[in-house]
Amino acid sequence: MGHVEKEREKSRVSIVKVAGRDRALVAAGVRQAIELAGGMADLIRPGMKVMIKPNMVAPPPSADSGACTSPLVCQSVADVVKELGARPIIAESSARGADTEAAYRIMGYDDLRCLGYEVVDLKRDTTVQVKLAGGHVLTEITTFELVTQMDAIISVPILKTHDQGQVTLALKNLKGLVVDGDKRRIHQLGMFEGAVDLVGHFKPVFAVVDAILGQEGMGPLLGIPVEMGLVLAGRDLVAVDAIGGRIMGFAPDEVPITRVAAERGLGSLDESRIEVVGERVEAVRRRFVRCEEDDRIDSEGIKVIHSEGTCTGCRNGLLSSLFDMQAAGTLERARGTTVIAGPTPFPEGIPQEMLVSVGSCSLPEAKRLLRYVRGCPPNNVDIIRALLADDGEAT
């Protein structure tokens, strides 16, 4: 192929409608999406070990919350991989402090194990340190031995919003391939640059997005489920994320990780350079409620403040504590409180008695507050005690 012709080649992203959530319909939709996106026959060869990487951020409130990738989607991708003569392994490590096995159990991945599919909790695997050539903020990471043995990685996220980067899709999904300590370190060094460093290192070959049931609002765990009935697929993860974000109502350059990955040359952000096949974006898009627009907690008179350095474990623990209090009818007692999560600067003009600080990585002045909750991640019971002003510092 000539240089000019190669430059004109577009990234292809498929969008396929799925008529329901039963096994046969999901399998047909996933297969069609993969085929429309160019298939994987030239990427996956007989004898290869192929990691299928779902998004299992943490144990979700339910299997229908839109927080975690459906096992039916992963099963369908695994079947395609097996047909190509390769060995598919579904593997994940959930957010810092989160129980991957509990997430698998709630979502129904144990059923796949019963059927003979390999489903691995990476947190139980041996860890290894590897160097990152060309990393912008990461020069070394600790990953898992199984990951280093893979011949190819397929990112299989779910379509959802995120409280730090607008959305979390195929690119950010790779953060689950490092140990909990590095997940936290990435947030502290710069989440978007760090996540793109991981993409550049692991080089996923394909993405299949579970957009059958997504999540809007306070993602990545405690948002509101959204029925979309779609599957997206493509080889260019930047293009896949750009189109996935567009379907949710986000311009591609609004999403920091997509923008950074494109700037590094990892894929196409320019929609004029992306060929969408199957359904048209205009026909399926739906503006998702953004995290800052989800006022379920703000309406209760509680203000939550976090920064890019606040990791998923802290944010999820805090929000789940607030929703637990809301369900128990005790959130009213914390009205007027401002909660600072992780290494986040103090807001001005708020009396210290109305502040709660959460997380062992809090700034020194935050740790001196009467209501400071240590822990990485902090325990929900301790967070609730602090919010209710029970016994001062929680440990």
Predicted regions and their residues:
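N-terminal and secondary-structure boundary signal
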Residues: 1-395
